[in-house]
Structures are given as C-alpha cells and as structure tokens.
C-alpha cells in the first residue's frame, strides 16, 4: 500500500483514490461541465438508474455561484471540490468502509467525535431523494452519506450508496488551518503551494462575474435553448447528450439566481422545468439500457 502525504490537499485526494480503488471502485475523471454537486456526474445520476451494478469514485469540481464571496470569506467558495463514491448495490459494510477511509487519511476514529446525524437528502432539479446522514467530525460536517431511493423520478433498485466528502473541510481539519486559502495543496521541490496561490484570484474574478457581469438576457435565452435541445434529443433517443443540456440549463439557472433575476415564484417554476427534463432523461436512459439487455448485470455477483 502506497503512502501519501495527507497533510497536503493533493495527497489527501491521492489517498482517497487509492483507498477506494482497493475496494474495487473504478476511479473515473471529473465531469468537464459546470455542475453544482458531484451527484450530477453521469456516474452517479445515470448509473443509479436501473439494475446494473457500478462502483466508482471521482473528484468533482462543483460550482455554486451564489456561494461566492470575492475571496474574502475563509470558509465559502463559489467553486470547490467534492470526492464522490458511488456503490451500487450498496454494500452492508458501507459505513465501516467510510470510517476506514478516514483512518487512511490520518483521522483516528477512536479518539475523534464522529457522528452520523440523520439528514435525508433531496435534489429537486434531479427528481432525486434518499435516506441519509450528515457525518460530523468534532462538530463540523465533513461528509454526506445517502442511500438513493429515487433518481429522475424512478425508484432505485438496487439502492445506490453515495458518499460525498467535502474535501476542503476535511483538509482544513487534517492540516489544522482556519482558512481554505491557507491549505497546502502540495509541498514539492519548488516549496509549498497553497490553495490560495492556485484559486484565490479565480474566486475574486468569478464572484464578480456571477454577481455583476453575467448577461441576464443571454442566460434566459440559454436556459430556453437548452430546454428545447434536451427535449429534441430525448425524442431522438439520445439520453446522454440530452442530459448534458439539462446540466447546462441548471447552471444557467444558478447564474440567474446569483444575479437575482428570478423571483421566488419564478424560481420554483424553473426548478420544475429542470426536474421535468431530468425525469425525461432518466426514463430515456432506462429504456436504452433495457433495450441493450442491461449489459453490466453480467458483473453481478451470484
């Protein structure tokens, strides 16, 4: 077993990837689109649909425009990182595996206060919900743990287990720093490189874009066009490209929200429009996999 320097953000990610690879997960790459959470990645949203098994893990950059603070808040970012683990069907020892993963990154579970606090999860735009827990480490939420019950309006059978690590929060605890920007990303031949060195300017400028410069009219047009394109692609039987349009529409909506361009009443209407697209994608994807004979079911352990 290779040892990684989990006192760096880079080493923390490598250690988690190594641990979950040894548990049989496919280590896939981040989605190359703007999404608000790792759950949007097709490896979670689409692979939770239908009977086919899938164990995977990946880092996902997440964008939440309304959370930007111009780089002035030490704990809030408009772009941050999640480490996502998806286990389908969910193994009986999934909680034990999570606790072992904490040990691997240098957190002694025998001396720290680790609590599973009931917090059922829901994503209105994805038509998804699940039974879940927030996992608290010494009073700070660091992970969300969910058993998916429904995705895209479809019942999940078998149930998918999802573990979402908040990488920045865990790293702040492991490194003992009070600001995300003080996190050591890596410590190499050229010295220490911090999170702030890499991302602070991005937080300042992207916050300015999200709150001040994003073109509202263009975003409304983009949302409407993505909605139309997704519907056309569903009619053409192309669930995966249709889903990409759903994600683009969702990000346009999030930017409009940051620009305060949508009223409370309109907000719910837009959420329902994205939800309708997500459900159509889920049904189309299920139908396509069913027509293929659910090929990954051959990997189910008898």
From Swiss-Prot:
It catalyses: tRNA(Gly) + glycine + ATP = glycyl-tRNA(Gly) + AMP + diphosphate. Its main location: cytoplasm. It is found in: Cytoplasm. GO terms for molecular function: ATP binding; glycine-tRNA ligase activity. GO terms for biological process: glycyl-tRNA aminoacylation. Keywords: Aminoacyl-tRNA synthetase, ATP-binding, Cytoplasm, Ligase, Nucleotide-binding, Protein biosynthesis. One of its GO terms (cellular component) is cytosol. Its EC number is 6.1.1.14. The keyword Ligase applies. HAMAP family: Gly_tRNA_synth_alpha. Tetramer of two alpha and two beta subunits. PANTHER family: GLYCINE--TRNA LIGASE, CHLOROPLASTIC_MITOCHONDRIAL 2, GLYCYL-TRNA SYNTHETASE. NCBIfam families: glyQ, PRK09348.1. Belongs to the class-II aminoacyl-tRNA synthetase family. This is Glycine--tRNA ligase alpha subunit. It comes from Psychromonas ingrahamii (strain DSM 17664 / CCUG 51855 / 37). The gene is glyQ.
